[in-house]
Amino acid sequence: SSSDDAASNDSANSAETTESGSGEGKVQTVTDGKLTVATSPDFAPYEFYAIDEDGNPTLSGFDMDLAQYIADYMGLELEIVTVDFDGVLSELQTKSVDLGMAGLSPDEKRESIMDFSDIYYMGGQSLVTVKDNADKYNSFEAINKSDVTVGAQTGSIQLDLANENTPDADIVS
């Protein structure tokens, strides 16, 4: 699964800068000397807030470690911009950031407006419901009814899949 599955956090933007960078960056970035990365920290283990020993939230996760590694490799300081998931896509489209790291899954629409790295994790998509409804809601056909509510994150591939496969359902994002 991708962070497309995760619930959206609040829409306030914030930036966190980490010190590293072992020299002058040789690549053009949004801000000289920095690698600016947008993320939506609501999709553990990729990006999320962990509470440190002092009780303070700190950005953590695989994508955050990878972003730091890339910044270090390039000799740049890392700046993380936190936004809602659909904000990551907007930040990329407006070229306000150098990278978006939020468990993004490539699809034709996204590939027409942005470049993707090689895939470093292969996930899948599935329907999720409470255990008591597992036998009742076990296919697209079973949930493609006007009295069934289907939820998916705004801007996600899952929202596209819900619209394509369950057009008669009450789809909310």
Descriptions of predicted regions:
Residues V37, P41-A44, P57-D72, L104, ...:
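Bilobed "Venus flytrap"/periplasmic-binding protein-like clamshell domains
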Residues E77-A142:
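Acidic, polar ligand-binding/catalytic clefts
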Residues E24-L35, Y120-S126, A142-S146:
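Phosphate-binding glycine-rich loops and adjacent basic patches that engage nucleotide phosphates
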Residues E24-G103:
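Extracytoplasmic small-molecule ligand-binding "clamshell" domains
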Residues S1-K34:
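Short, low-complexity disordered leader/linker segments with a strong preference
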Residues E53-G55, S117-D118, D168:
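Glycine-rich, phosphate-binding/catalytic loops in enzymes
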Residues T31, M74, R110, Y121, ...:
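Short, structurally constrained coil/turn elements
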Residues P45-A50, K109-E111, L161:
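A short acidic, helix-capping loop that chelates divalent metal ions and anchors anionic groups
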